[in-house]
A protein has these predicted regions:
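Core catalytic lobe of class I
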Residues: 1-203
Length: 203
C-alpha cells in the first residue's frame, strides 16, 4: 500500500540531497551531541558527513501533529506548551495534509539511514493524522517491521464536553529496521518500599 499525493519526492532525490552546511568538528558515536538548528539539515549532515550512518540503535520523534495551531510558553510554565494567546510563541504548527506528510516522510527516510540493523524508531503522533503516518512508515520501514501501536493516555475525559467520545490518548508508532531489533523489557525492579507495600503477606 502506498500514499500518493502532490509534491511527493522520490526516495532517491531525498537521499541524494546534500547538506548546505557542516559541523565545525567531526561527529563521533562515542560522545553526546546536541544540534540546535533545522532538523532536516541536521539529518542530512548526520547521514552524509558523519560516521553515525547505520549506527543508531534508538530514535524517538515527537513532531508537530498538523493541528494548524499556535503554541506558546511562559516563564511561569517552562515545562509545558499550551495554546494560550498571551504567552510567548514556542512554535506554529501550520503544515497540513500532504505538506505535513511529505515534511515528515523526508525526515523518516533519512532517519532510517541512521538506524543500525537492530535499531528501532518510535514516533509520537495523534489520532487525527496518525493513520496516514502509519501508511508512510509502512512504506519506509516495511509493514513487516511494524512492532506496536503504543497508547499514551494524556488526560482524564471527565471534563470533555463536546458531543463525542473523549480525546484522551495519543499514539506512539514503534518500528524496527529489521526483524531482529534490540529489545529490553520495560520493567523496573521493585524497591524495598514497594515490596513492603504491595506484598504484605509472607507464604
Amino acid at each position: 500500500m502506498e500514499l500518493t499525493y502532490n509534491g511527493k519526492k522520490s526516495k532517491k532525490e531525498i537521499l541524494e540531497t546534500l547538506p548546505q552546511s557542516d559541523f565545525s568538528k567531526p561527529v563521533s558515536e562515542k560522545e553526546n551531541i546536541l544540534i540546535n538548528g533545522d532538523n532536516l539539515e541536521a539529518l542530512r549532515i548526520l547521514v552524509h558527513n558523519s560516521n553515525l550512518k547505520g549506527k543508531v540503535d534508538l530514535i524517538y520523534i515527537d513532531p508537530p501533529f498538523a493541528t494548524n495551531g499556535t503554541f506558546t510558553i511562559s516563564e511561569e510554565r517552562t515545562s509545558t506548551i499550551s495554546s494560550s494567546k498571551k504567552d510567548e510563541i514556542a512554535y506554529t504548527d501550520n503544515l497540513l495534509g500532504e505538506d505535513f506528510l511529505e515534511f515528515l516522510r523526508e525526515r523518516l527516510i533519512l532517519a532510517r539511514e541512521l538506524l543500525s540493523e537492530r535499531g528501532s524508531i518510535y514516533l509520537h503522533i495523534d489520532y487525527k493524522i496518525g493513520h496516514y503516518v502509519k501508511i508512510i512508515m509502512d512504506e519506509i520501514f516495511g509493514a513487516e517491521n511494524f512492532r506496536n501501536d503504543i497508547t499514551r493516555i494524556k488526560c482524564n475525559p471527565k471534563n470533555f464536553s463536546r458531543r463525542a467520545y473523549g480525546n484522551i490518548k495519543d499514539l506512539i508508532l514503534f518500528y524496527s529496521k529489521t526483524n531482529n531489533p534490540i529489545w529490553n523489557e520495560p520493567f523496573v525492579p521493585f524497591s524495598e518500599e514497594d515490596k513492603a507495600r504491595l506484598y504484605k503477606k509472607v507464604d
